[in-house]
């Protein structure tokens, strides 16, 4: 959790900070993000919480939500040491077919509560990111999938593990890594 006084994550890092900052200041997070030209996903996810599938479009439409329990003990974020600036990357050439494929795999994984399928979706998304010129992420022992968070090109990266033992071992072995857990109110 973050507040205006307690922000214990790096800024400009891909964790939805600009959307969160707008919400904490009483602004409409979706409008604030759209004004930056970066999309509505972060403030919509923050406002809704949980493990969500959203319909693509100009404004957020929630398709499906669950608690995310299948992710408990299986995720960590890794600080790459490089800030990123999503608005400066919005004009990059994108592989929309591969992005759509990753999204469809993720949607099916959430509906089926299938961790392995979700890891495949994350790996497909990472393939898109590499195609957009992002640097390869650090290999972490025990990780089954990883990708940059947010707009990528730096910031935090998500790493997924088969179980909490593997995740906790990776966190202990990698100083810039911290465990994260799903949150649903």
What kind of feature is each model-predicted range?
Residues 1-16, 25-151, 158-185:
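C-terminal nucleotide
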Residues 22:
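Conserved active-site tyrosine of GNAT-family acetyltransferases
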